[in-house]
């Protein structure tokens, strides 16, 4: 229980600090550093506990593509041929996506599951993920963040895998 509290406070503190610093320094360095900092939350966890194993890598990658497709459906409806992200912003988007997944669906999910079971892990990590974005997104967008968290968390639980959510989240962030 103590580990869960520490992970939750650490994840939210890092996410909110990144959002606040971004307002004064600009998005590219802040997002990249924030993503790397969030990745540090996973230190000390066994890869298997985080859903990171090398077995069945192809299905996990394909699952990530499917997750990305689901997350991008609303954006695809309104897409108007927007250009690709410039490389510095793309690198930052990758860093924050990987960092958020390691933190929210990796360490936080594992701590919630150990303390309260899989349903609490899916719901709790999704709610905390949405709450972590309150400083960086408008209120209505938080519902989309919550929905994305539920999709990513459900995959994490059902497949016992974090590769799919990392791939899906990264592709969605690169496309949005």
Segments (PLM) and residue ranges:
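Generic transmembrane alpha-helix motif of multi-pass integral membrane proteins
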Residues: 36-39, 95, 107, 150-160
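Structural signal for the C-terminal ends of transmembrane alpha-helices
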Residues: 14-17, 39-48, 73-77, 155-157
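Hydrophobic alpha-helical transmembrane segments
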Residues: 4-5, 60-65, 90, 119-124, ...
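Alpha-helical transmembrane segments in multi-pass membrane proteins
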Residues: 1-43
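Aromatic-anchored segments of alpha-helical transmembrane domains
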Residues: 8-19, 68-77, 126-134, 170-176
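Function-critical hydrophobic alpha-helical transmembrane segments in multi-pass membrane proteins
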Residues: 76-134
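Juxtamembrane helix-entry segments on the extracytoplasmic side of multipass membrane proteins
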Residues: 25-30, 59, 80-91, 138-143, ...
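Functionally important transmembrane alpha-helices
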Residues: 141-176
